[in-house]
Amino acid sequence: MADVNKVVLAYSGGLDTSVILKWLQDTYNCEVVTFTADLGQGEEVEPARAKAQAMGVKEIYIDDLREEFVRDFVFPMFRANTVYEGEYLLGTSIARPLIAKRLIEIANETGADAISHGATGKGNDQVRFELGAYALKPGVKVIAPWREWDLLSREKLMDYAEKHGIPIERHGKKKSPYSMDANLLHISYEGGVLEDTWTEHEEDMWRWTVSPEKAPDTPQYLELTYRNGDIVALDGVEMTPATVLATLNRIGGEHGIGRLDIVENRYVGMKSRGCYETPGGTIMLRAHRAIESITLDREVAHLKDELMPKYASLIYTGYWWSPERLMLQQMIDASQAHVNGVVRLKLYKGNVIVTGRKSDESLFDANIATFEEDGGAYNQADAAGFIKLNALRMRIAANKGRTLV
């Protein structure tokens, strides 16, 4: 094995990463530093400390990254109205660059020469973690146990844990049949019955949202205040970024908003079915497009829409820390200078309905757009010349016999 003195492990305290911790100690004979991120996944993270201590770990990091996650990663992504392949709001993808960043920061603080993660060799996360790590610390060593060991089933992991005295729950409360990932933006479900693309997902799978059919019969209205493209207040009450998202998750979940069942194209080449709950993100996407509709210039809005799929792909495939993503982010952020105002929404049985938008910087001019008498604000006769000039190239082509029918 490569010479490794100290490694920082992205550690959840679960079976996989607990086995990895012991495996690193035995295989590399190295000191392990554990890092557990609180990204709003809704589970207690402190038990990870006790588990790590019981396994001889002396340097343990448990960091509350919720505000940084939403402020510096989720909000910048939503300024671009980012959606991967038309549906996926990138809840897992956007969390990985922050974890990679913190892994490298801790490696620098502790003098570690390697990092390790529990991502499998089949998924996107291995790419996301490692591209981020190499961008931030080019010489770092990366240990990916799932690409090295022969513990390729849950049963083998549990046998290894029992053999080495790692606390596990082989019996007890029923384990979810799905592979799940959660943070403040979303919760995802993969595997189990979802591996058959024709099988309908089970209703009791969902954790955050009620079924739209069982959502309240009375709609709820909500006002979101924007400043430079980011939400700063809900119903007039100013909130921090993480509080905004947590509140929207709760309200959206109550109204059955944000469920997805999709098949996506993984970066490693395979197709994968996943179900997602993103109630707050679904509301934010709809509201942000609404405030941009009155504050962005037409060509700026269209250019953003053209670039968004590329931006989304960069995030999905792990290139958050790349120069091209940073370049696109500067352009996106510059476009948000005038994206200020308030959007009013109606939430009803899984639907997010825009019912109003207003801004002191609105480019909507009712005097020009009106269907009534406009007092000469717009001369309709000007449209004739506009149309003729735009038709000129097509008329020339037609005169040359280049007819389309």
Swiss-Prot record:
Its EC number is 6.3.4.5. It comes from the Bacteria. InterPro entries: Arginosuc_syn_C, Arginosuc_syn_N, Arginosuc_synth, Arginosuc_synth_CS, Arginosuc_synth_type_1_subfam, AS_cat/multimer_dom_body, Rossmann-like_a/b/a_fold. L-citrulline binds at Y88, S93, N124, R128, S179, S188, E264, Y276. It is found in: Cytoplasm. Pathway: Amino-acid biosynthesis; L-arginine biosynthesis; L-arginine from L-ornithine and carbamoyl phosphate: step 2/3. Pfam families: Arginosuc_syn_C, Arginosuc_synth. It catalyses: L-citrulline + L-aspartate + ATP = 2-(N(omega)-L-arginino)succinate + AMP + diphosphate + H(+). The keyword Endoplasmic reticulum does not apply. L-aspartate binds at T120, N124, D125. Its main location: cytoplasm. The keyword Iron does not apply. ATP binds at A10, Y11, S12, G13, G14, L15, D16, T17, S18, A37, G118. Keywords: Amino-acid biosynthesis, Arginine biosynthesis, ATP-binding, Cytoplasm, Ligase, Nucleotide-binding. GO terms for molecular function: argininosuccinate synthase activity; ATP binding. It is an enzyme of class 6 (ligase). One of its GO terms (cellular component) is cytoplasm. GO terms for biological process: argininosuccinate metabolic process; L-arginine biosynthetic process; urea cycle. SUPFAM superfamilies: Adenine nucleotide alpha hydrolases-like (SSF52402), Argininosuccinate synthetase, C-terminal domain (SSF69864). Homotetramer. Belongs to the argininosuccinate synthase family. Type 1 subfamily. This is Argininosuccinate synthase. It comes from Pseudomonas fluorescens (strain ATCC BAA-477 / NRRL B-23932 / Pf-5). The gene is argG.
